[in-house]
């Protein structure tokens, strides 16, 4: 299964540079420095994508309490250093609304996630004092007890559940618009492996017993700070949805799904791991869950 998240990252995150204010300030002044302004929805401007830092509004120069160093990209031999900040964007497009690819996908995902974390981490969880940005924007430090905290990522599994006839299970969440379906997903609990989360969530949401599960790939999803762990699984039993989170679910053959789509059923977009997993199954390219390596 292929997708926009490749093994080799396009974004060099420049972690060693984050703690050197003078270097960050010099990078900001570089003619190759670019700024992504991200609105509270996660929307960014796409026409153009990013702007020279020299054209950024507000206070001049790099501000270590406002600007986040995302890292460096190289496109067609040209290097650019990218920063991000929270702000207003006219007609901004989010990851859900646009199909970003390559370096742009990594930049928007990182910016959306880290700025959402800053919005929610302004006070210390230990003593309640205000925190301040540090580490080039990938750290916060408490002004009271000096505790240092870092951006959190919440792991979640997402799974294509197949039956013995190679049909796929698709469910409709109660909060979704009518006709929208996807594969099952859920957050990992404390001390739980991804495979165990697959077994638990499939049983809780659909009443099915998983007998095999295989890891496929992962995708960061910054709404607000998830890392989606993609699986394919084999399950048996009678579908029994919880009717709270999942309103209904059913098995689909490829022919049945094609017909349902013609009748108005909607699937996740190909920019999401859910859409790519479903697409791989429809094309007959999804690996079988049997034979997964156990270590």
Model-derived regions, located:
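Hydrophobic alpha-helical positions that pack around
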Residues: 198, 202
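Surface-exposed, charge/polar-rich loops and edge strands
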Residues: 192
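Cys/His-rich short segments
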Residues: 109-162
């Amino acid at each position: 299964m292929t997708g926009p998240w490749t093994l080799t990252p396009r974004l060099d995150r420049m972690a060693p540079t984050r703690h050197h204010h003078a270097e960050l300030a010099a990078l900001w002044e570089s003619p190759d420095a670019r700024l992504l302004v991200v609105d509270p929805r996660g929307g960014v401007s796409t026409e153009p994508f990013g702007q020279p830092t020299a054209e950024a509004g507000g206070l001049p120069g790099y501000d270590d309490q406002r600007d986040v160093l995302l890292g460096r990209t190289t496109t067609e031999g040209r290097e650019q250093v990218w920063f991000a900040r929270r702000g207003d964007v006219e007609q901004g497009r989010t990851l859900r609304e646009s199909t970003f690819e390559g370096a742009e996908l990594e930049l928007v995902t990182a910016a959306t996630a880290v700025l959402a974390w800053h919005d929610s981490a302004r006070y210390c969880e230990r003593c309640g004092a205000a925190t301040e940005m540090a580490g080039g924007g990938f750290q916060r430090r408490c002004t009271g007890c000096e505790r240092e905290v870092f951006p959190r990522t919440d792991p979640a599994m997402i799974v294509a559940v197949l039956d013995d006839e190679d049909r796929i299970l698709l469910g409709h969440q109660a909060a979704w618009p009518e006709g929208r379906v996807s594969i099952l997903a859920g957050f990992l609990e404390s001390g739980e492996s991804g495979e165990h989360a697959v077994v638990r969530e499939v049983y809780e949401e659909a009443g099915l017993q998983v007998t095999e599960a295989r890891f496929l790939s992962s995708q960061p999803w910054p709404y607000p700070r998830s890392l989606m762990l993609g699986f394919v699984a084999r399950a048996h039993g009678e579908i029994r949805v919880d009717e709270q989170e999942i309103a209904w679910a059913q098995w689909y053959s490829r022919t049945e799904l094609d017909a349902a789509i013609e009748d108005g059923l909607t699937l996740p977009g190909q920019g999401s791991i859910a859409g790519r997993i479903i697409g791989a199954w429809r094309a007959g390219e999804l690996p079988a869950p049997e034979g997964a390596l156990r270590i």
